Design a protein with these regions (language model features):
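Short, hydrophobic/amphipathic alpha-helical packing segments
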Residues: 152, 215-223, 279-290
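Active-site cores of enzymes that catalyze phosphoryl transfer or operate on phosphate-rich substrates
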Residues: 119-200
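Active-site palm subdomain of RNA-directed nucleic acid polymerases
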Residues: 219-246
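Conserved core architecture of multi-subunit DNA-directed RNA polymerases
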Residues: 40, 65, 100, 158, ...
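Acidic, low-complexity intrinsically disordered tails
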Residues: 100-125
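Common nucleic-acid-contacting/processivity interface regions adjacent to the catalytic cores
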Residues: 1-78, 84, 91, 170-224, ...
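C-terminal polymerase-core module
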Residues: 250-295
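Compact, glycine/acidic-enriched structural inserts
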Residues: 84-108
Length: 295
């Protein structure tokens, strides 16, 4: 009953098997009284209200496996968590607001650091920071990022095989590996959720919120990048992002098509080609800009 009622059991079991291979004993599960008193909520995904009206030739771009990628990039795991930066705001830090910050380590508040000193601290001590201010060591790969990396590679392998058999016309094998890659996707995306589940053995609200809040920051940054791409070409200062949902941004290709092909009536076939070209351009621009966000 519990294996079905609590889908976290599968993920917990995978972690326990991995720890056993390493010869590491996992911590005990929290007892039921702890579970009952620890049902705090954590920040979820960011959803932007859609721009009202009818929008033509809309395309969407999504961040591949956003939550698993965040966990792997920041090295979010129970044993890699170091402390917290008080009053952390990623956008303010990027904008150089000349704030000072203090760090809490082992329950003790340390002295004030300038932005430059804090950046030096991150670099010299191999530390990453999430959007809720939690610090993680990055000199040693964490348990959960290691598992996710393995599952991520397995999904890529299944997708590659699905494409291979699809191109060969083998529908049975294509269907099998396509289902397998989809299952891997579900498993990958489930991990962040159970981090904030009190019945999960490795429950940690900070780690759960580190994932979702960083996701919020990342998708908002994506919107800014997309708008910058549009505004730079069009010579405007507008918000062209029609809608945001978790890991996806939606734009219309119409403004750019009208700028590039003035006074030209394009057929649906030609418009489809143009929208694919524009989506590919914007996607490339976004991908090349994410390193700035990571730094």
């Amino acid at each position: 009953y519990e294996d079905i009622q609590y889908d976290s059991r599968f993920l917990e079991g995978a972690i326990l098997v991995y720890l056993k291979k390493l010869g590491v004993v996992a911590p005990n599960k929290p007892d039921r009284t702890e579970m009952g008193s620890n049902r705090e909520k954590f920040t979820g995904a960011y959803v932007q209200d859609p721009q009202r009206g009818k929008h033509d030739w809309v395309y969407d771009l999504d961040i591949t496996s956003m939550y698993p990628s965040i966990i792997m990039s920041l090295n979010i795991s129970p044993e890699t968590k170091l402390g917290k930066v008080v009053g952390w705001n990623a956008e303010e830090f990027i904008s150089k607001k000349n704030k000072t910050y203090s760090i809490i380590m082992n329950g003790k508040k340390q002295g004030q650091l300038t932005e430059t000193e804090l950046q030096d601290y991150f670099d010299k001590n191999h530390v990453s920071i999430s959007s809720n201010g939690i610090l993680y060591r990055t000199d040693k790969k964490g348990l959960i990022p290691t598992l996710l990396s393995s599952w991520f590679d397995k999904r890529k392998e299944f997708r590659k095989l699905a494409k291979k058999f699809g191109d060969e016309g083998d529908e049975e094998q294509y269907g099998y590996f396509n289902r397998r890659q989809h299952i891997q996707k579900i498993v990958l995306n489930s991990m962040y959720g159970v981090l904030g589940l009190p019945v999960f053995r490795f429950y940690d609200l900070d780690n759960a919120e580190a994932t979702t809040k960083t996701g919020q920051s990342l998708i908002k940054f994506t919107r800014k990048l997309g708008n910058h791409f549009y505004n730079k070409e069009l010579g405007t200062d507008k918000d062209y992002c029609i809608y945001i949902d978790t890991d996806s941004v939606f734009y219309s290709a119409v403004p750019l098509v009208k700028k590039r092909y003035p006074n030209v009536e394009l057929s649906d076939v030609m418009m489809t080609q143009r929208i694919n070209e524009i989506a590919t351009e914007v996607q490339g621009f976004l991908n090349n800009s994410y390193n700035y966000f990571a730094k």
